[in-house]
């Protein structure tokens, strides 16, 4: 199992905590952590097993809480997923993609990007992944290091003689670049 760390907090894998809303409103926690990998399994519908039971009344089948017989379940908490996937429907629809992105290590970057670019959670996981793919410029210790790397990458320093490169003010260049880029936790993306 891969552990991802964001700002010093270790997150094992993408997951939601699905719980009974009635129990929650009455001060009791009755729920279960469901990981993206569990949600991709064929018996994903059974992940509420132990939390809920199926009950049929007048040809209507509903999931009922085993503790209070409430019939509403909701996501109470989530970890290592963008806000747009923090509801049960989106989580289950994107579970396979979330698990794959987590295994490649890209999911943590998408969570960071979503926090900066989309705090309201309006962008889909596909839109975030596309934005990341088209605009990511890597991880750097400081804005100055990013500016140096960017200048070398785009060839801004190619025409400057080697002995004159020490006179380039990369701190100022970094301030100018950050009008066109955004950064969070040492990662840089071009604004689109």
Over which residues does each language-model region extend?
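Structured domain cores in non-transmembrane regions
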Residues: 41-121
């Amino acid at each position: 199992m891969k552990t991802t760390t964001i700002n010093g907090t270790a997150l094992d894998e993408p997951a939601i905590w699905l719980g009974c809303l009635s129990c929650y409103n009455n001060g009791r926690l009755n729920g279960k952590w469901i990981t993206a990998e569990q949600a991709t399994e064929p018996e994903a519908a059974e992940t509420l097993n132990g939390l809920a039971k199926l009950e049929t009344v007048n040809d209507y089948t509903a999931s009922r809480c085993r503790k209070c017989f409430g019939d509403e379940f909701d996501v109470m908490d989530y970890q290592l997923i963008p806000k747009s996937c923090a509801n049960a429907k989106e989580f289950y629809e994107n579970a396979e993609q979330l698990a794959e992105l987590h295994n490649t290590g890209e999911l943590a970057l998408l969570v960071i990007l979503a926090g900066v670019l989309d705090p309201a959670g309006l962008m889909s996981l596909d839109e975030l992944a596309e934005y990341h793919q088209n605009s990511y410029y890597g991880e750097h210790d400081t804005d100055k290091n990013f500016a140096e790397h960017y200048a070398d990458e785009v060839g801004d320093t190619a025409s400057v003689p080697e002995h004159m490169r020490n006179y380039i003010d990369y701190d100022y260049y970094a301030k100018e670049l950050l009008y066109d880029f955004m950064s969070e936790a040492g990662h840089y993306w071009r604004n689109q």
